[in-house]
Amino acid sequence: LLTRGRANTLRLALSGQLGAEGLSNPELLAAMDLCVGCKGCKRDCPTGVDMARMKIETLHHYKARHGFTLKDRLIAYLPRYARHAARWSGLLNLRNKIPQLAKLAEYVSGLSAQRSWPTWHNTHFFNQATQGVTKEAVLSAHKPVVLFVDTFNGYFESSNAQAALRVLQAAGYSVHVASKTEGGHGANKGHLCCGRTFLASGMVDKAREHAHELINTLLPFAERGIAIVGLEPSCLLTL
């Protein structure tokens, strides 16, 4: 279904032509399901139709009425449980190696056995000793920069985050890795999340909480004109 078809289906739902369920209509959800949220339609369409936002609103209303599945919650809350799950990396990674476990996981969670899970690592970016300078140091530095490390690069592809840190430091920058508690720069302070996983599951209110937390943390740096560097386009575009 093309963007125009999805938009027409949404119009039918809003006008009541798909029944009394409105935005919580299963037919509307099916029409929106294949939208990947790339925002290409908003960028390229002459009328600026933002289908990605419409999909999120549809998910929000549908899930508010029909409830969230275990699959929804596993995706949405990944940033919150990733730190704990990483400790069990050896066990969790068996799912990708044993087909029977993949099928069992699909039965329990709803996540397809035909797709591999991200590889967990017991050692990741957020529990490494070297994570840049403190907030106070970067605010007074000659060449300051703030690095926003997202959940996926922090836990699943730590080499990307480590490489970004090394490149910035090699360029002469004082790098601060933003965290929930800005009193230091240790791993236990908690990493920041843009809320993208919650949006993908229709949990708009939870996504808003994380977005506010991220913006409030980064605001002091932005007000000083300090550059904020991110690694994951989806996370940056969510802001």
Where are these regions (language model features)?
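Mobile "lid/hinge" segments at catalytic clefts and subdomain interfaces of large enzymes
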Residues: 1-18
